Amino acid sequence: MKARMQTADIRKQWEGAAPGWAKWEPTIATWMEPATSAMLTMADVDLGAEVLDLASGAGSQTLSAARRVGARGHVVASDISETMLQHVQENARAVGLHNVTTLAGAAENLAVTEATFDAGICRLGLMLFAEPAKALAAVRRALKPGRKIAVVVFTTPTNNPFMAKPMQILLRHAGKAPPPPGQPGIFSLGASGVMERLFLASGFVCVEQRSLAVPLRMPCATHALEMMREAFGAYRAVVSDSPEVVRVAAWKEVAEILKTFETSTGFEGPAEVLVAAGLKPP
């Protein structure tokens, strides 16, 4: 019951964030390009492959995968938000890609045929799933033997200060505690050893990992604030049930902390992600 409640809450928060995420998708795509490229390579996304993309969002990494696999390949974009998937379809049509289809639902309960996919990918979604181990196990069943999944997650609060400090501010104003270990959260899978243990517990082997610095560069802190308020569902959700006066005060303080990351050339937010991959045993 608890997992179902979490899933419903996650669906609600991302349906609400979908328009903002789609608006900022080009910025997010540029920001995460090094991580996306590494993820696709580590998952062995090659020409002609059948790829499952979990938590696709508006689909910039879906389209990157679709270009890699070519006309003989195929990418299934899956997301808990049907609105997100509408954006995936629109974005694919806009660039003339016809090898993308969508599948709505929580990653833990996807209706996919066993052993049909050559690769699985998930960029910045796994740490926010209600049951990440269950989601990975579902992907393992969907993969052909000897095939891989690769994911991107944020590492630690220390290495992602422009994201960690605003979250701390929002939680404090809302009177809420950070998610306890094992619960969905921005940094829940980023500590040393966590992803490897999760992959192994989910039945994967030959786990590979690499950390990447992915600083967010924008013209100014105001742009970073707008993106955070409009697109980051986990941040929006923290104060969504707070009185307006609390929300206003919280976001005002967030704006002030984001300004501390401005330089002479604009906003630069230090960020780090972990790209991890696991192999389904042959």
Annotate each predicted stretch with a short phrase:
Residues 50-110, 134:
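Class I SAM-dependent methyltransferase SAM/SAH-binding core
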